[in-house]
């Protein structure tokens, strides 16, 4: 399959009870993805609790993932921020060996205009030695990258090869798909609307639930890409309750509960994030038991 088509997963960061990085669990998580049909891995994205990691910890995570992956799957590294010059500098000094692309979130908090967003990605596209996937997640950034801006970026910044579209708006996603060149990838960043986006011409997903249910979720996406609509929706409706559960109290509290139930990680987060409530954990555990 073409690179960055199908199911990518935004890896969590497993922690031990003392909140240090659980490298063994991370290695096992990577291997679990490889063995169950995932097409690529995203390292140090939002789901990884990157905001709580030191630079040394980030380098350790990169090392562990690369060693566990052993060249099996393409790797995407999260590099982004709301200081354009800072992102440019990070791209210039970062060890990108072993990575195939960059995932870069649209600037958050300072709420740039569409022109500011365009110029931000223009600057980092010039600095990046790797292809860039833009990440639009207005629920976290407070600014939405509009379809027209995505199209402008797609046509003018050749190093930007796709967008992880996580506005949760299927109409906006379809407009993006209709505007951009055929070789520009519109990738779902919302697990619940991954299938309709894929059937509308999207290229798959960068998923959270996918790392917990890798075989079933990646099979759903492949079925959608192959036009097997009935088969894809059958899987979607089987998986859908888990998607509601894992985001009910924020990410990655829910997916960590699910992965802990499967025995892959310890259910530990760093403040300001906290574990899911006992009520939600019970729902997730019951889902896993009956899946």
From Swiss-Prot:
Q: Which InterPro entries match?
A: Aldolase_TIM, DapA, DapA-like, Schiff_base-form_aldolases_AS
Q: Which residues form the active site?
A: 135 (proton donor/acceptor), 164 (schiff-base intermediate with substrate)
**Cellular component per GO?**
cytosol
Alphabetized GO MF terms: 4-hydroxy-tetrahydrodipicolinate synthase activity
Pfam (any one): DHDPS
Coiled-coil features, chain-numbered ranges: none
Positions contributing to pyruvate binding: 47, 206
- What SMART domains does the annotation carry? DHDPS (SM01130)
- Top-level taxon: Bacteria
| Pathway noted in the entry | Amino-acid biosynthesis; L-lysine biosynthesis via DAP pathway; (S)-tetrahydrodipicolinate from L-aspartate: step 3/4
Q: Name one GO biological process term.
A: diaminopimelate biosynthetic process
Q: Where is this site: Part of a proton relay during catalysis?
A: 46, 109
Its EC number(s): 4.3.3.7
Note whether Repeat occurs among the keywords: no
Q: Where in the cell is it found?
A: Cytoplasm
Q: Could you tell me what reaction this enzyme catalyses? A: L-aspartate 4-semialdehyde + pyruvate = (2S,4S)-4-hydroxy-2,3,4,5-tetrahydrodipicolinate + H2O + H(+)
Q: Which function does this protein serve?
A: Catalyzes the condensation of (S)-aspartate-beta-semialdehyde [(S)-ASA] and pyruvate to 4-hydroxy-tetrahydrodipicolinate (HTPA).
Entry's PANTHER family?
A: 4-HYDROXY-2-OXOGLUTARATE ALDOLASE, MITOCHONDRIAL, DIHYDRODIPICOLINATE SYNTHASE
Report the family membership. Belongs to the DapA family.
What is said about its interaction partners and assembly?
Homotetramer; dimer of dimers.
Name under which the protein is recorded:
4-hydroxy-tetrahydrodipicolinate synthase
**To which species is this protein native?**
Christiangramia forsetii (strain DSM 17595 / CGMCC 1.15422 / KT0803)
Q: What is the lineage of its organism?
A: Bacteria, Pseudomonadati, Bacteroidota, Flavobacteriia, Flavobacteriales
């Amino acid at each position: 399959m073409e690179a960055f088509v199908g199911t990518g997963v935004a890896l969590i960061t497993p922690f031990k009870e003392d909140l240090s990085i659980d490298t063994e669990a991370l290695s096992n998580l990577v291997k679990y993805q490889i063995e169950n049909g995932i097409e690529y891995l995203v390292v140090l994205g939002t789901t990884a609790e990157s905001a709580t990691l030191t630079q040394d910890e980030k380098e350790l995570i990169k090392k562990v993932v690369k060693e566990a992956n052993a060249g099996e799957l393409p790797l995407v590294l999260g590099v982004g921020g709301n200081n354009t010059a800072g992102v440019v500098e990070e791209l210039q000094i970062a060890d990108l060996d072993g990575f195939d692309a960059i995932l870069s979130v649209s600037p958050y908090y300072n709420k740039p205009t569409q022109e500011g967003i365009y110029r931000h990605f223009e600057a980092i596209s010039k600095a990046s030695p790797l292809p860039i996937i833009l990440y639009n997640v207005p629920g976290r950034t407070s600014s939405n990258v509009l379809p027209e801006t995505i199209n402008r970026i797609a046509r003018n910044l050749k190093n930007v090869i796709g967008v992880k579209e996580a506005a949760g708006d299927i109409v906006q996603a379809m407009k993006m798909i209709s505007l951009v060149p055929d070789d520009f990838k519109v990738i779902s960043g919302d697990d619940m609307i991954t299938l309709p986006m894929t059937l509308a011409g999207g290229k798959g997903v960068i998923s959270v639930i996918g790392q917990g249910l890798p075989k079933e979720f990646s099979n759903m996406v492949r079925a959608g890409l192959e036009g097997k609509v009935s088969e894809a929706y059958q899987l979607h409706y089987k998986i859908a309750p888990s998607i509601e559960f894992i985001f009910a109290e924020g990410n990655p509290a829910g997916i960590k509960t699910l992965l802990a139930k499967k025995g892959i990680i310890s259910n530990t987060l760093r403040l300001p994030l906290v574990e899911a409530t006992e009520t939600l954990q019970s729902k997730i555990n019951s889902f896993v038991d009956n899946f």
